UniProtKB/Swiss-Prot annotation:
Family classification: Belongs to the radical SAM superfamily. Lipoyl synthase family.
Top-level taxonomic group: Bacteria
Organism: Bacillus pumilus (strain SAFR-032)
GO molecular function, one term: lipoate synthase activity
Domain Radical SAM core: 53-269
Full protein name: Lipoyl synthase
Pathway: Protein modification; protein lipoylation via endogenous pathway; protein N(6)-(lipoyl)lysine from octanoyl-[acyl-carrier-protein]
Binding site for [4Fe-4S] cluster 1: C40, C45, C51, S280
A Pfam cross-reference name: LIAS_N
Cofactor(s) for this UniProt protein: [4Fe-4S] cluster
Residues the record lists as binding [4Fe-4S] cluster 2: C67, C71, C74
Localization (cell): Cytoplasm
Keyword check for DNA repair: no
PANTHER family on file: LIPOYL SYNTHASE, LIPOYL SYNTHASE, MITOCHONDRIAL
Length: 298
């Protein structure tokens, strides 16, 4: 008789305090009124209440709400996507200006159905924010765009303040975790972005708790640094539903602190590491630190 897979109990340090105030309800109302999507909601981010209610920040998700991929860790809907909304860039920019955001993060579903991977709408969103909210710093978080570097150039030519592309997991687990992406393509994507705009900080994140080893996590650090990535984020994988990959381990906060110490010693300009850390967590602080380091090196 097959042994039943053991359930890993969620520890107390992952319990989240839900802050719901006027900021939270106001942001949610604004998103719905403008027909906008956020990865905060779609990916069930554990920090949504802190970011919306306390920090008043949000990560906009453009190119629709349906992804053409089906990564086994991600809660975003998958299937046949809708037509591109060419008015979306202006609505996002209007919301950024209305919210008076210091830092805006723009991510997107993967659009493998589009020849340009959605790069044109992505780029126009950056340009629209620059026009309507010129003092807002902008972080872009695209998919690998199928490895089409002309599409990446379209985005990098807008000169975002940070280019973020997540490698998500260690090399060994990549085929299981995100079957339609590759570890090496993500590394090349990050390297090419830096080659196109050497002064723009690049960033990548991984989730841990999927069965990786500490040595494999450190290997990811080395691989990112070898491809000139400046900023790294490390967070705990949380299973969005029973259909997704199970959590193999919950890392203690002390283990995250050790990983951050290792990453910083290796040479990252910034590393955010913790159980609830996600790619966009405290992104406004990261762009400031990266800018200071660039100025010091100039």
């Amino acid at each position: 008789m097959a042994k039943k897979e053991e359930h890993v109990r969620k520890p107390d340090w992952l319990k989240i305090k839900l802050n719901t105030n006027e900021n939270y309800t106001g942001l949610k109302k604004m998103m719905r009124e403008n027909n906008l999507n956020t990865v905060c909601e779609e990916a069930k981010c554990p920090n949504i209440h802190e970011c919306w209610a306390v920090r008043r920040t949000a990560t906009f998700m453009i190119l629709g709400s349906v992804c053409t991929r089906a990564c086994r860790f991600c809660a975003v809907k998958t299937g046949l996507p809708t037509e591109l909304d060419l008015q979306e860039p202006e609505r996002v920019a209007d919301s950024v200006a209305l919210m008076n955001l210091k830092h805006a993060v723009i991510t997107a579903v993967a659009r493998d159905d589009q020849k340009d991977g959605g790069a044109g709408v992505f780029a126009e969103t950056v340009r629209a924010i620059r026009r309507k909210s010129p003092f807002t710093t902008i972080e872009v978080l695209p998919s690998d765009m199928g490895g089409n570097y002309d599409n990446l150039k379209t985005l990098m030519d807008t000169r975002p303040d940070i280019l973020n592309h997540n490698i998500e997991t260690v090399r060994r687990l990549t085929p299981r975790v995100r079957a339609r992406a590759t570890y090496d393509r993500s590394l090349e994507f990050l390297r090419r972005a830096k080659e196109m705009q050497p002064d723009i900080p690049t960033k990548s994140s991984i989730m841990i708790g999927l069965g990786e080893t500490k040595e494999e996590i450190i290997e990811v650090m080395d691989d990112l640094l070898a491809n000139n990535v400046d900023i790294m984020a490390i967070g705990q994988y949380l299973q969005p539903s029973k259909k997704h990959l199970k959590v193999q381990k919950y890392y203690h906060p002390d283990e995250f602190a050790e990983l951050k110490e290792i990453a910083m010693a290796k040479g990252f300009s910034h590393c955010e590491a913790g159980p609830l850390v996600r790619s966009s967590y405290h992104a406004d602080e990261q762009v400031n630190e990266a800018s200071k380091k660039r100025q010091a090196q100039a």
